[in-house]
Amino acid sequence: MPERYGPRVIEHLVNPRNAGEVGGPSGVGEAGNAACGDQVRFTLRVGGDLRLQEVRYRAYGCAACIAAGSALAELAEGRSITGAAQISRGDIQEALGGPLPPGKEHGATLALDALHRAFEDYWSRQGDALLGGEGLGDGSGGRRGVVAAMSGGVDSAVTALLLKERGYEVVAVTFRLHDGEPGSRSCCSPDTVLFARETAHGLGIPHFTLNLRELFDRRVMRDFVGSYAAGRTPNPCVACNAHVKFHAAAFLADRLGLRHVATGHYARVGEGPCLERPEDGRKDQTYVLWPVPPRLLGRTIFPLGDYRKSEVRRIAEERGLAVARTPESQDICFIPDGDYRSFVRRRVRSEPGEIVDRQGRVLGRHAGVVDFTVGQRRGLGISAPTPLYVTEVRPRSRQVVVGSRRELEVRRMLVRGANWFLDPREAALVQVRYNGEPVPCELEEGAGGWEVALLEPVFGVAPGQSAVFYTRDGAKVVGGGIIARRDA
């Protein structure tokens, strides 16, 4: 045995702990690849009290992987699932007598990743409860704890830090939403999951990953593609908040007996509950939070609502967080290169068609309606003496209608699928774009949804986008919905 390994490593190699397989396991996880030389596999049995009754491992490859698997299995068995989820790479190396030799540190990383994949498998076996979002409680009977969504960025890291400093029992969770690109650090990509786990362990809190690929594909990605094919302009963040992120965090909180959920959004929760704008108006994210069900909003904490972004970064720097200077992601999380047209085209067939004006005169040709959205000016492929904008997309006839900016003017719209926090009669302002200015409005409920009269014209309103209503002072969100139709 090479002398560079310490006596505890050698002890685990000569006398491995918990080697083998759990029969009928609650969860199974693997990391690495035997074809590449190193692989670790964990199987575990979780009791009704969420304690790890049995933990077994198998490891193939270098001595560091085998010893790390043995040490981790011994550390994890008998702990609560949250206690085991708090074990860090440093804890494994300490159990092995100190840092592993240079070039062998990956042994602890692989072992830890295999265990966490077993946790992930355990939660996935909850199946219907996790994917359906049904039967979620209001958290009233839970402990003073919180499941904090952690994306790998500075906002979610500081969120978890602030909650811990306020005395909450904090459990971090990262959502595996899509496969992503190798090396990508977009929100919830594979590499981000590992980075978020390192950040959580650095804060001394447990970390779990929930595999939500199926749910995210069904409720967000397919809707995204289908909307463009139907001539609408979707907002995937709204769909995720409506059907995925908050439901999944509440699912985990319920299973762990914790009262609250938290995210790094810049918003506040007021009495009612109602959604309120944050301290930092430039970072206001209430526009994408309107679909959160009131029963979930009532148990949600937004710690960053009382801070400005500059203060959040300063807190991260003062506490020595590695994410302090992480750049913000401006792209759709599952399209990190920003090329949504290529993404949609890979998933739906789009036929060529005509570009016409409002009178039906043909001005040019296009390669597919999925390339266009209302308000678009660039990429039309036609020349004109004055600027032209997309004013309508007609998927059935495969026509893209263009016109002057004035033809984008909208004074009425129909909103469907509304979610209300306050009495709709309190709605005095409406915002139709993420960074748009709210304008005065009047609402009237009809058989097909909410008819909205805009007291000031708005340009470029796109079906499929959100209409979010605010109180007269603009401070509180009354509710929101999806724009189904717009009229001049």
Swiss-Prot record:
Key words of the record: ATP-binding, Cytoplasm, Disulfide bond, Multifunctional enzyme, Nucleotide-binding, RNA-binding, Transferase, tRNA processing, tRNA-binding
Which chemical reaction does it catalyze?
Answer: S-sulfanyl-L-cysteinyl-[protein] + uridine(34) in tRNA + AH2 + ATP = 2-thiouridine(34) in tRNA + L-cysteinyl-[protein] + A + AMP + diphosphate + H(+)
Record-listed ATP binding positions? A149, M150, S151, G152, G153, V154, D155, S156, F175, G264
Annotated spans, NifU-like protein = 1-130
Source organism's superkingdom?
Bacteria
Residue ranges of the TM segments: none
**Stretch list, region Interaction with tRNA:** 283-285, 433-434
Gene Ontology terms, MF aspect: ATP binding; iron ion binding; iron-sulfur cluster binding; tRNA binding; tRNA-uridine 2-sulfurtransferase activity
Record-annotated active site: C240 (nucleophile), C333 (cysteine persulfide intermediate)
Question: What cellular-component terms does GO give this entry?
Answer: cytoplasm
Segments of this protein annotated with the region tRNA-specific 2-thiouridylase MnmA: 143-488
Name the residues annotated as site: Interaction with tRNA. Answer: H265, Q465
**Intrachain S-S bonds:** C240-C333
**Biological role stated in the UniProt entry:** May be involved in the formation or repair of [Fe-S] clusters present in iron-sulfur proteins.
Any idea what this protein is called? Bifunctional protein NifU/MnmA
| High-level lineage | Bacteria, Bacillati, Actinomycetota, Rubrobacteria, Rubrobacterales
